[in-house]
Curated annotation (Swiss-Prot), chain A:
Biological processes per GO annotation: cell fate commitment involved in pattern specification; egg-laying behavior; embryonic morphogenesis; nematode pharynx development; Notch receptor processing; Notch signaling pathway; protein processing
Gene that encodes the chain: aph-2
Ranges of the Cytoplasmic topological domain: 700-723
Protein family membership: Belongs to the nicastrin family.
Transmembrane segments: 679-699
Organism: Caenorhabditis elegans
Protein name (record): Nicastrin
Sugar-modified residues: N40, N181, N271, N328, N409, N627
Swiss-Prot record, chain B:
Spans within the Lumenal topological domain: 1-17, 79-101
Function: Essential subunit of the gamma-secretase complex, an endoprotease complex that catalyzes the intramembrane cleavage of integral membrane proteins such as Notch (glp-1 or lin-12). It may represent a stabilizing cofactor for the presenilin homodimer that promotes the formation of a stable complex.
Species in which this protein is naturally found: Caenorhabditis elegans
GO cellular component: endoplasmic reticulum membrane; gamma-secretase complex; Golgi membrane; membrane
Localization in the cell: Endoplasmic reticulum membrane; Golgi apparatus membrane
Top-level division of the source organism's lineage: Eukaryota
Tissue expression pattern: Expressed from 100-cell stage in most somatic tissues, including neurons, muscle, intestine and developing vulva. Little or not expressed in early embryos.
Family in the record: Belongs to the PEN-2 family.
UniProt entry tagged with the keyword Nucleotide-binding: no
Cytoplasmic topological domain residue ranges: 39-57
PANTHER family assigned to the protein according to its UniProt record, in alphabetical order: GAMMA-SECRETASE SUBUNIT PEN-2 (PTHR16318:SF0)
Self-association state and partner proteins as the record states: Component of the gamma-secretase complex, a complex probably composed of the presenilin homodimer (sel-12, hop-1 or spe-4), nicastrin (aph-2), aph-1 and pen-2.
GO annotation terms (biological process): cell fate commitment; embryo development ending in birth or egg hatching; embryonic morphogenesis; germ cell development; nematode pharynx development; Notch receptor processing; Notch signaling pathway
Protein name: Gamma-secretase subunit pen-2
Length: 723, 101
């Protein structure tokens, strides 16, 4: 018995961790760099590790022809190997003609994606690489839910979409990891070159370079299942010793949305007077996604449009008194909304519409405080949205309206469109106007508000007509190499659109249009373009570094905090909302009334201890000088959760009027590279191990207890002491 | 307990008690009763006491089989629907599996 106990203790005492660094070359993979599971109400998508797809031999797919090897499972190169493969694959080879091979391959464990370094230009038509669907947000379309159209009737993204439903709506059997670090990529490539690269005669032999990777999701099924399982009353026997609450399996995709009110209307002190104003909401979306959701800069999908709105906001901010005066007279106001999660069935705008209907937008009201007056859906006259700015074919833009609503209020809408046309023309761009009552609005935030109110009008300004011209909307490849001409053209477009926004907004509010149209700051547009688009990271340029003023900290080791990403995600794990918030404060904030405030502490006290909660006070540097000041602004940075998956709105649970996108909680492990030996080698090693173990048992077995007991009395006895 | 040292009267009494306890929705007790008294019931010469033991053992066997069928049917039924992630199956689940429905 004791012998067995000794054996068990010896075996249990062995820790193999100490050898792992000699067996594996480990590459750290941060959050967001790998494919994980996402859900909507009915399906699960993305990747999940299992026994079948963790390990594999590393191979390369460098060009189109290499996909032939995927069909034959590289048998001609590795005839003695019967396991699976991890394929090194540049992102630009994910195309319409290759995606089905990747999906159906039975010999792939996964793919290691990397940027090829091949430059793609904004006007490049050879790469149809939109990771979005042919009909983006088809399930949340106003016309579908209003039963005016069939599902995906207008295939607006058919030129660019790689698959009909988009790459984010694929339940992959394989795993995916994105390697952005060139050192890590070199290590993998070197491992491949040393061991796996076939010789000149096409042969190869053991040992091979293998790779293992594991990303384990907690949730499965669909949003409905994982949302329910996260509730405390989901189970009859809820026993969680740690916290007492149900463990989180998945979470609703949510992040900050930014709403800026240049001319805010305060709530009345007693809340008895309901003020009815009219609003034009100028909006641009702030999110994008890719096949691996987080890997998405969204240059054209997001950033150029945001710059044009920011430039318009800045122009407005510099002459706010005129706008304030006009708004007071006309009772019409303009506000800016940057919605997050719009590419995933309108998370931000859906939540905003819900809050408007319930009198909670933009702020929750406390009767003892003064807030920004709640905006109701019926107070929204126009939603002026801009999309995909900077990639127009020629110098032509399109305005998209809902035909039926347009006919109802044609005169006023024509006036808005006319001002947009004037703004564009001032920069030598043309506008194609709506054609008639049959017009439909492309995917836009308007759809959320159209469901809430029958009169809200859409004015969508974009460089496409019936179909998207840009073929990389929502894609890992929405990241361009801008030549000087392309950059200049994009900046001109942004300037023109910004002017058009200003012109339309000015006319709506009642400001003399000619006073503001010439005020768009092209230099600012150029600076922000270079900072947000050309630079490698948000804070790489001087302007943004000064705006940051040491305030930005990489709080998480996630892709979104260390790389440019506009993905919404499940937590505030991306830097972009912070970047945009600071830029909006810069655009619309003012220190005229706070010149005597000289410290961050006194600035924050201004906002905290006042009954007047309409304004926020931010201690922020001027991006030109770097000097801090206390900026007063009516800007609301607000986390918006889709009501369908928000525990605060149980009455709307899984209501498909709203987005039901959720993300799984997951555990991500590092990539391990190791040498794979032939099976016969492993059998030999097992045999040696067994023989060694047996010999050890016999060696220990011959010992008795006395073998290990040193008789301490013996030397003493020899010295004459009694035993 | 070594029941071989008990008298037949005490064995009948014990077998009866186990049968009655098993009747309180405790099929495992019936199974124990079956194994425990099977040899007395069926492998030894019959007498009045052993006839009674046989009666209880047969009843325990029938009850055990009934429970096995019921529990197996429930398990198959429950697992079939549990894998679909239905509300009622989730409600009755003790631990949710991670990474799968």
């Amino acid at each position: 018995m004791k012998k067995w106990l000794v054996i068990v203790l010896i075996i249990a005492g062995i820790r193999c961790d100490g050898f792992s660094d000699q067996v594996f070359r480990t590459l750290f993979i941060g959050e967001g760099n790998a494919c994980y599971r996402t859900f909507n109400k009915t399906h699960e998508f993305g990747c999940q590790a299992n026994r079948e797809n963790e390990n594999g031999l590393i191979v390369r797919i460098d060009k189109q022809e290499d996909f032939k090897n995927l069909d034959s499972c590289w048998n001609s190169f590795y005839p003695k190997y019967s396991g699976k493969y991890w394929a090194l694959l540049p992102v630009n080879l994910i195309r319409r003609d290759t995606i089905s091979q990747l999906k159906s391959s039975k010999c792939l464990s996964g793919i290691v994606l990397y940027n090829s370094g091949e430059s793609i230009h904004p006007g490049d038509e050879s790469t149809a690489a939109s990771h979005d669907a042919e009909c983006p947000n088809a399930a949340s379309d106003y016309y579908l839910q209003d039963k005016n159209e069939e599902y995906c009737e207008r295939k607006i993204n058919s030129r660019g979409a790689i698959t009909r439903d988009g790459l984010m709506k694929i339940d992959w059997r394989i795993q995916m990891v994105f390697i952005d670090n060139s050192t890590d990529l070199e290590i993998i490539e070197k491992c491949y070159s040393m061991f796996n690269k076939p010789k000149e005669d096409g042969s190869s032999g053991y040992p091979y370079c293998g790779m293992s990777f594991r990303l384990a999701n907690m949730a499965a099924g669909n949003s409905e299942i994982c949302y329910r399982r996260g509730k405390n009353d989901a189970k009859l026997f809820q026993m969680n010793i740690d916290s007492g609450d149900a463990p989180q399996l998945c979470g609703a995709m949510h992040s900050d949305n930014i709403f800026a009110f240049p001319t805010p209307i305060p709530t009345s002190p007693t809340n008895e007077t309901i003020i009815t104003s009219k609003y034009m909401m100028v909006t641009a979306r702030m999110d994008s996604f890719g096949m691996i959701p987080e890997i998405s800069v969204g240059e054209v999908s997001v950033l150029t449009s945001i710059i044009s709105v920011l430039a318009a906001a800045r122009s407005m901010g510099t002459q706010i008194e005129k706008w304030q005066k006009a708004s007071n007279t006309s009772n019409r106001n303009v506000f800016f909304a940057f919605f997050n999660g719009e590419s995933l069935d309108y998370i931000g705008s859906g939540a905003a519409a819900y809050q408007m209907e319930n009198g909670k937008f933009p702020q929750m009201i406390r009767s003892d405080r003064t807030h920004i007056h709640p905006i109701r859906p019926n107070e929204l006259d126009y939603i002026l949205e801009v999309q995909q700015i900077g990639v127009a074919k020629g110098r032509k833009y399109y305005v998209h309206v809902d035909g039926e609503r347009y006919q109802q209020n044609k005169t006023q809408t024509d006036r808005v469109i006319d001002r947009i046309e004037r703004g564009l023309r001032s920069h030598a761009f043309d506008l194609e106007k709506p054609s008639g009552s049959g017009d439909r609005v492309p995917p836009a935030s308007w759809h959320s508000f159209a469901k809430a109110d029958a009169h809200v009008q859409s004015v969508l300004l974009a460089p496409y007509g019936k179909e998207y011209e840009y073929q990389r909307v929502n894609s890992i490849l929405d990241k361009n190499e801008w030549t000087e001409d392309e950059r200049e053209k994009a900046i001109q477009e942004i300037e023109a659109v910004s002017t058009a926004i200003l012109a339309a907004a000015a006319d709506y509010v009642g400001v003399e249009t000619d006073e503001v149209v010439a005020k768009v700051d092209k230099k600012l547009i150029t600076t922000i373009f270079d900072c947000l688009i050309t630079s490698n990271f948000w804070f790489d340029c001087d302007f943004m570094q000064k705006l940051d003023g040491g305030r930005y900290h990489k709080l998480f080791n996630s892709y979104g905090f260390n790389q440019k990403s506009t993905y919404i995600s499940m937590e505030s794990h991306t830097a972009f909302p912070t970047v945009l918030h600071w830029l909006t404060i810069f655009a619309l904030g003012s220190d005229k009334e706070t010149l005597n405030v000289k410290s961050e502490k006194s600035c924050s006290h201004l906002g905290q201890f006042q009954a007047f909660q309409m304004y926020t006070y931010t201690w922020q540097p001027n991006p030109y000088t770097g000097n801090f000041s206390c900026l007063k602004s009516a800007i609301v940075k607000k986390v918006m959760v889709s009501p369908a998956v928000d525990s605060q709105t149980p009455e709307e649970e899984m209501n498909t009027r709203y987005s039901t996108w959720m993300e799984s909680v997951y555990i991500i492990e590092s990539v391990n590279l190791y040498l794979m030996e032939d099976a016969s080698f492993e059998y030999t090693m097992i045999l040696i191990a067994v023989i060694s173990a047996l010999l050890s048992i016999f060696a220990v077995g011959r010992c008795s207890e006395t073998t290990f007991i040193v008789d301490e009395g013996e030397p003493a006895a020899e010295g004459g002491e009694p035993l | 307990m070594d029941i071989s040292k008990l008298t037949d009267v005490k064995k009948v009494d014990l077998c009866k008690k186990y049968f009655l306890i098993g009747a309180c929705f405790l099929p495992l007790v019936w199974i124990v009763n079956t194994f425990w008294f099977f040899s007395d019931a069926f492998c030894k010469p019959i007498n009045a006491h052993r006839r009674q033991i046989r009666k209880y053992v047969i009843a325990s066997i029938v009850g055990s089989i009934f429970w096995i069928i019921v529990l197996s049917a429930w398990e198959i039924f429950f697992q079939h629907y549990r894998a679909q992630g239905l509300v009622w199956t989730d409600f009755l689940t003790f631990v949710f599996p991670t990474g799968r429905v």
